[in-house]
């Protein structure tokens, strides 16, 4: 049964909506966060294995869309060589149909730029985007 297309998405949706109701939230999210993570894989890879030059990782990359509670809305896994601005397009394809109440996203600064993900989200989906800058680590305090 779990091998059928869309089964895990349906299970995840049912659990997520119940949790959101328990948290006194609307079952459908109104904002989300997108991020990616590159993960090392073992020695022999398949088609979905590649090298992420920015993070210096050989393996796979996952793009995640979560709600403001951190609950998974959608995930895509592909080769680590896929650039973030291309991965977000794959992740969010038809997301406006799946999540009609989701007009706003937070993205990290890696999605900034005319040809990058933030511009594509605004132009294609009509959603607003806030770019979140990486927090700088405070300088270590000198001890005398």
What is the role of each PLM region?
Residues 1-144:
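Short alpha-helical elements
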């Amino acid at each position: 049964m779990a091998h059928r297309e869309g089964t895990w998405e349906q299970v995840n949706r049912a659990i997520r909506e119940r949790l959101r109701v328990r948290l006194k939230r609307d079952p459908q999210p109104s904002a989300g966060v997108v991020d990616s993570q590159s993960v090392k894989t073992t020695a022999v890879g398949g088609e979905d294995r590649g090298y992420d030059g920015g993070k210096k990782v050989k393996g796979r990359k996952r793009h995640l869309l979560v709600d403001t509670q951190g609950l998974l809305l959608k995930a895509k896994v592909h080769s680590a060589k896929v650039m973030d601005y291309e991965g977000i397009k794959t992740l969010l394809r038809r997301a406006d149909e799946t999540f009609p109440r989701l007009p706003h996203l937070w993205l990290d600064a890696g999605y900034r730029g005319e040809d990058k993900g933030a511009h594509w989200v605004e132009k294609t989906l009509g959603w607003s985007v806030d770019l979140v800058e990486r927090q700088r680590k405070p300088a270590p305090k000198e001890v005398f």
